[in-house]
From Swiss-Prot:
Example of a GO biological process term: translation
Keywords from the named record: Ribonucleoprotein, Ribosomal protein, RNA-binding, rRNA-binding
PROSITE patterns recorded: RIBOSOMAL_S18
PANTHER family: 30S RIBOSOMAL PROTEIN S18 (PTHR13479), SMALL RIBOSOMAL SUBUNIT PROTEIN BS18M (PTHR13479:SF40)
Family: Belongs to the bacterial ribosomal protein bS18 family.
Function: Binds as a heterodimer with protein bS6 to the central domain of the 16S rRNA, where it helps stabilize the platform of the 30S subunit.
Protein name: Small ribosomal subunit protein bS18
UniProt-listed HAMAP family: Ribosomal_bS18 (MF_00270)
A Gene Ontology cellular-component term: cytosolic small ribosomal subunit
Gene behind this protein: rpsR
MF-aspect GO terms: small ribosomal subunit rRNA binding; structural constituent of ribosome
Species of provenance: Polaromonas naphthalenivorans (strain CJ2)
Subunit structure: Part of the 30S ribosomal subunit. Forms a tight heterodimer with protein bS6.
Length: 94
């Protein structure tokens, strides 16, 4: 009886290492602008950090610092509670 086939390391598709090396360096736009606090009433800024589904985009994708990411989270949650931002954009029509 033949045993379970093992995955051969040589036949694995190789990753494109060049794209990993030349990623664009992300920077915190709040640090660059000199912002100290993020306001929940600034809807235009907050919309840049919310996806189409209504989820808050993580800091590793946006490049914001941890301090500002926490402020974005609280500001988005406050704006949602006050109905300035929707919880989700996908409303089903009956």
């Amino acid at each position: 009886m033949a045993g379970p086939k093992r995955f051969n390391k040589d036949k694995r598709p190789k990753r494109n290492t060049q794209s990993l090396l030349f990623k664009r360096k992300r920077f915190c736009r709040f640090t660059a602008a000199g912002v100290e606090e993020i306001d929940y009433k600034d809807i235009d800024t907050l919309r840049d950090f919310v996806s189409e589904n209504g989820k808050i985009i993580p800091a590793r994708l946006t490049g914001t610092r941890a301090i500002f990411q926490r402020q974005i989270n609280t500001a988005v949650k406050r704006a949602r509670f006050l109905a300035m931002l929707p919880y989700s954009d996908q409303h089903r029509s009956l």
